[in-house]
Amino acid sequence: MTLSGVAAQTLRDVQVIVADQSQEPVTHSQVVQTLGRVIEARGGSVEWHSREPIHGIAEQRDFLLKRASARAVLYLDDDVLMEPWVVERLLDTLDSEHCGFVGAFPAGLSHLDDVRPEQHIIEYWNGPVSPEAVDPGSPQWERWQLHRAANLYHVSQSIPRDALPRLYKVAWIASCVMYDRLKLLEVGGFSFWPRLPRYHSGEEVLVQNLLMRRWGGCAILPSGTYYSQVPSTVLNEAGTVDGHALDLLAEMIEQYTRMAPTVKTTT
C-alpha cells in the first residue's frame, strides 16, 4: 500500500530506501517488486535492505538516516497511503518555512463516523513557522489530541476549500514526516538508540521537540494521508513498551539547544 502511494507521486525524482524487518522479506512479493520498478521507471531509485537483528524503531530510523543523502528525508510508515501531491507539498513547505520538519498525519478512516468535536482544537501558523518550546505537560502538549481517530480529517472537511491548504502547530507528529536532513543531524538524529530498550516509543517525539526549539515544525492541512491501522510492531508481548525516548529530553535539550538562539516558550 505504501509503495503504491510513492509510485503515484507528482514528485518523481525520489530515492526510496526500504528497511525491511519482516519475517519474510517484502521483496518476495511480486506486487512489491512491480511497485519498485514503477518508481524506477518514473525517475526514482529504490534500495532494498532486509535487516536483522531487530533493535527497535529508533535504530531503524538511524540506519535510514545514515543511508540518506538528500537535503530532505521523509520517514514514511509502512501502513500509510499518500495522495499524489503529498511529497511535493511537504518539500515546498520545508523549503519555504525553513523549519526542522513538516508532517502529514494520516487519518484512520475506520473512525469516519466517530466525530469528536471536543478534540478538534487546532492552532494555525498565521505567519512564518518559528521556534517554540513545547514542554511535556504544558497546554500546548495537548495538541496531540488532534491526531487521534479521524479528528484531523473531520477538521479538514469542515473548512471551506478556498481556505486550504493551511499549516498548523503540533506537539509532535508521526507516520509521515519530512525532515531537513542537516538540521536533524544537528540535534543528533536518532543516534541515541543504543540507550533505549528493544521495545520503545517516542523517538520522533524527542527529535521533533529538539528541532522545534531551534527551527520550529509544522504539519499540513489537509494531510492527504491515510493509514491501514495494522497492529504496531513496537510493542512487547504485553502490548506495551519498555521505555520512552522522552526520558532523554532534559539532557538532550542541554546538549543540542543550549547554544541555540532563545526561543518562544509555550508552557
Question: Where are each of the predicted segments found?
Answer:
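Short aromatic/hydrophobic "clamp" motif used to bind/position activated sugar donors
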Residues: 73
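A recurrent flexible, glycine/aromatic-enriched loop bordering the glycosyltransferase active site
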Residues: 134-154, 158-179
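The conserved acidic donor/metal-binding loop of glycosyltransferases
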Residues: 77-81
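C-terminal catalytic/acceptor-binding lobe
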Residues: 1, 159, 165-182, 186-267
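Acidic donor-binding segment of Leloir-type glycosyltransferases
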Residues: 5-49
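Conserved donor NDP-sugar-binding/catalytic core segment of glycosyltransferases
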Residues: 85-144
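Glycine-rich, basic loop-to-helix element that forms the pyrophosphate-binding segment
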Residues: 51-68
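Short, high-confidence coil segments that cap the C-terminus of an alpha-helix
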Residues: 70, 97-99, 215-216
